[in-house]
């Protein structure tokens, strides 16, 4: 999975 990927959001910001 790419950096910042979570099951909740495509990008963790």
Swiss-Prot record:
Plastid keyword on record: no
Superkingdom of source: Eukaryota
Alphabetical list of InterPro entries matching this protein: Bradykinin (IPR009608)
Gene Ontology MF terms in the entry: hormone activity; toxin activity
Matches recorded under Pfam families: Bradykinin
Keyword Hydrolase: no
Protein's GO biological process: defense response; vasodilation
Cell location: Secreted
Keyword terms of this UniProt record: Amphibian defense peptide, G-protein coupled receptor impairing toxin, Secreted, Toxin, Vasoactive, Vasodilator
Tissue specificity annotation: Expressed by the skin glands.
GO cellular component: extracellular region
Family that this chain belongs to: Belongs to the bradykinin-related peptide family.
Known role: Produces in vitro relaxation of rat arterial smooth muscle and constriction of intestinal smooth muscle. May target bradykinin receptors (BDKRB).
Protein name (database record): [Ala1,Thr6]-bradykinyl-Ser,Lys,Ala,Val
Record organism: Physalaemus signifer
């Amino acid at each position: 999975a790419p950096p910042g990927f979570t099951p909740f959001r495509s990008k963790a910001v």
